Amino acid sequence: RDWSSDVCSSDLIELGKFNQLEVVKEVDFGVYLDGGEEGEILLPTRYVPEDCKIGDFLNVFLYLDMDERLIATTLTPLVQVGQFACLEVAWVNQFGAFLNWGLMKDLFVPFSEQKMKMQVGRKYVIHAHLDDESYRIVASAKVERYLSKDRPEYASGDEVNILIWQKTDLGFKAIIDNKYSGLLYENEIFSTLQTGMEMKAFVKQVREDGKVDLILQKPGFEKIDDFSKTLLNYIREND
């Protein structure tokens, strides 16, 4: 079966993302939602809104439970398919690591998708996607391969959302808007940054090679700040 469709309708659902689905049946242990071609999908009692009734449309996240059955939840996971996040390792076994992403079933990272052997209690930046063969939701710490190679259409001064990804000799690499790679230069960072931090930033420039230089202060504001200091010094000297 193919969960990779970008279209979400009554007959096409998206695994690892939120879907608007209709309540079609009430049972003792929850309600069933119309999953189109996939049949009815259970939303367990603990996630059913109090005033829920047949015919209502609910915004639910879909994933596979411990028995590989399609199941719905109204909880918001820490990452969805197609997104990047910094998550903590809950446990490991002979097959790989399992990350806490806010749902009952932990998110699997196979050994082949780990840059270094993941350790319990440590956090790692990952990308969540559907495995091509099993259609399970899995994660990869090899985030470079999931970043867009297209040239970003940003202009200088554009505000973006970033996830601090990696410390380098030049500064910090960041993932921009869940899609592109950018760089914050060490000499332009005036606060303490750590891998996994999420924040707003501004585009300083998109270089000829398509790489994005970032800055935490809106371009131009540093000049205003310099002018303010100069003016203050002038007033003090001439008071």
Place the predicted regions along the sequence by residue:
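Intrinsically disordered, low-complexity linker/loop segments enriched in Gly/Pro
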Residues: 78-151, 165
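Short, small-residue-biased leader/transition segments that mark boundaries at the very start
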Residues: 2-9
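Short aromatic-glycine-enriched beta-strand elements
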Residues: 28-32, 95-98, 169-174, 211
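A low-complexity, Ser/Thr/Gly/Pro-enriched, surface-exposed linker/loop concept
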Residues: 53-71
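Strongly charged, low-complexity linkers/loops
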Residues: 213-239
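Beta-strand/loop nucleic-acid-binding surfaces
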Residues: 38-54, 105-117, 148-149, 180-193
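Long, low-complexity, charged/polar intrinsically disordered regions in eukaryotic proteins
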Residues: 172-223
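Structural detector for short beta-strands of small beta-barrel domains
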Residues: 13-27, 58-60, 81-94, 122-128, ...
